[in-house]
């Protein structure tokens, strides 16, 4: 028996290379491959890098689906099914809009593939009794089963030089706009620490990315994990929260374990907007500056993210956030417009208020990366998109990269630790290039250099 696993692209421009910053290792599919019995042959195709075949010589195809890849995934699946090959779909988009996903596949997995459900799907397929829907969320287990990913599938693909690892999944917070909250029902599941250490031991890269939704969901458990991975002498980064700065013991352990950078979602500098988002827990009474200094003092650089489009947001708020990120010497930053992901509380609110430009914006012909899919209060959709793009470009201008050079966290000592300085400069240059490439990148289609849809 042979299975083909496909990672769809967001979309492509014919004869143009795919965006480098979007080519991390696809951990979900290598994990799925790790769950697959040894007697099944696995073919792995990453459309971001590989060309899709015209015909599929395989027994079963598995496709992972995110909101931004959904349209492309459906096009691929429809072509494969027309050849008589059955398709199984899963991924976060299947959690958010299962009824939509189920229209484009023979079987759909809602929730994670661990816990025996993937083997159940394979057994049912072999016995010609495949069900339309499988739901692992019905059997919630706070312990997330560890699987050794098939990292051999990454060979010769040219991914970013980062080793991806997962220590937990989900997030306990309930932010209005967050698809993770909706997909995992604000629940967090952690893997066993000894299994994580074992997995890291199999990763050749010196820099790791913990692809957790929130690496510090439970401070006590994070400290235990840091103690366990410190002897491995790896550098790593992940997602955190600003309230980490309240726990000096945690920060020391993060630093000792090799943490060099954390992505922190500030989202807004306006307390009222944070409350509207459901992020009142992120309000820091002493101010962000002191907390950021504490993080820098522990050698932790910050990748700050901000989101705009709430009703009190204005051009001035974007400017204040940009100045704040530059003055605080953030290693990296993102200035994004609000995205009403399906299945989220934000999507439901905008739908009720009649503010969605298109109810299924992710499937709309002509939708491009950077397009705003709702009607903001203080901007036109085009103004909001351009304001966010301009802020990104200003943050990553050469003069502002130099301004953000900082030797406690971003670069350390450039003579004693040239790797950190090189990493800082490289990440900023790649980000600058990626911003230009991403803006107006086609979502869901392959287009030619003149914008004509090829497929």
Where are these regions (language model features)?
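Acidic, low-complexity intrinsically disordered segments
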Residues: 1-204
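Radical SAM enzyme core and accessory elements
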Residues: 2-5, 41-44, 104, 124, ...
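Catalytic cores of alpha/beta
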Residues: 98-103, 250, 312-327
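Radical SAM [4Fe-4S] cluster-binding motif and immediate context
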Residues: 147-303, 310, 323
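Flexible glycine/acidic-rich beta-alpha junction loops that bind and position SAM and/or redox cofactors
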Residues: 8-14, 100, 220, 272-278, ...
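A structural motif corresponding to the C-terminal end of an alpha-helix
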Residues: 35-43, 291-302, 328, 394
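A structural preference for short, hydrophobic beta-strand core positions in alpha/beta folds
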Residues: 44-46, 89, 238, 304, ...
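Aromatic/hydrophobic pocket-lining residues that form the small-molecule binding cavity
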Residues: 29, 73, 118, 193-196, ...
């Amino acid at each position: 028996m042979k299975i083909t696993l496909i990672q769809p692209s967001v979309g492509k421009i014919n004869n143009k290379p795919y965006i480098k910053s979007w080519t991390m290792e696809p951990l979900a599919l290598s994990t799925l491959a790790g769950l697959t019995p040894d007697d099944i042959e696995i073919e792995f195709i990453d459309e971001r890098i590989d060309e899709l075949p015209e015909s599929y010589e395989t027994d079963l195809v598995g496709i992972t689906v995110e909101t931004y890849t959904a349209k492309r995934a459906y096009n691929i699946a429809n072509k494969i099914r027309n050849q008589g090959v059955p398709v199984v779909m899963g991924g976060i988009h299947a959690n958010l809009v299962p009824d939509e996903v189920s229209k484009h596949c023979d079987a759909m997995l809602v929730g994670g593939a661990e816990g025996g459900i993937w083997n159940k799907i394979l057994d049912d397929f072999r016995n010609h009794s495949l069900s339309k829907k499988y739901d692992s969320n019905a059997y919630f287990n706070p312990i997330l089963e560890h699987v050794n990913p098939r990292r051999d599938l990454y060979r010769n693909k040219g991914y970013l030089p980062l080793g991806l690892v997962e220590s937990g999944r989900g997030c306990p917070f309930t932010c209005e706009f967050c698809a993770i909250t909706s997909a995992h029902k604000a629940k967090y599941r952690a893997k066993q620490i000894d299994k994580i250490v074992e997995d890291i031991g199999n990763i050749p890269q010196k820099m790791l990315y913990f692809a957790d939704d929130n690496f510090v969901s439970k401070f006590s458990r994070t400290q235990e994990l840091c103690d366990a991975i410190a002897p491995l002498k790896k550098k790593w980064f992940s997602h955190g929260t600003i309230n980490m700065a309240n726990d000096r013991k945690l920060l020391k352990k993060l630093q000792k374990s090799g943490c060099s950078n954390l992505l922190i979602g500030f989202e807004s500098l306006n307390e009222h907007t944070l409350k509207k988002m459901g992020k009142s827990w992120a309000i820091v009474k002493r101010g962000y500056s002191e907390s950021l200094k504490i993080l820098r003092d522990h050698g932790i650089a910050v990748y700050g993210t901000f989101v705009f489009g709430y009703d009190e947001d204005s051009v001035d708020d974007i400017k204040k956030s940009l100045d704040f990120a530059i003055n605080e010497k953030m290693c990296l930053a993102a200035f994004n417009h609000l995205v009403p992901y399906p299945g989220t509380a934000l999507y439901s609110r905008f739908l009720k208020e009649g503010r969605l430009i298109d109810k299924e914006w992710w499937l709309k012909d002509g939708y491009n990366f950077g397009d705003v899919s709702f009607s903001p209060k203080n901007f036109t959709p085009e103004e909001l998109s351009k304001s966010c793009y301009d802020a990104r470009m200003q943050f990553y201008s050469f003069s502002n990269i130099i301004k953000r050079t900082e030797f406690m966290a971003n670069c350390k000592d450039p003579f004693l630790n040239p790797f950190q300085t090189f990493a800082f400069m490289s990440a900023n240059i790649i980000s600058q290039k990626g911003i230009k490439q991403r803006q107006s990148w086609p979502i869901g289609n392959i287009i030619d250099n003149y914008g004509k849809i090829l497929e």
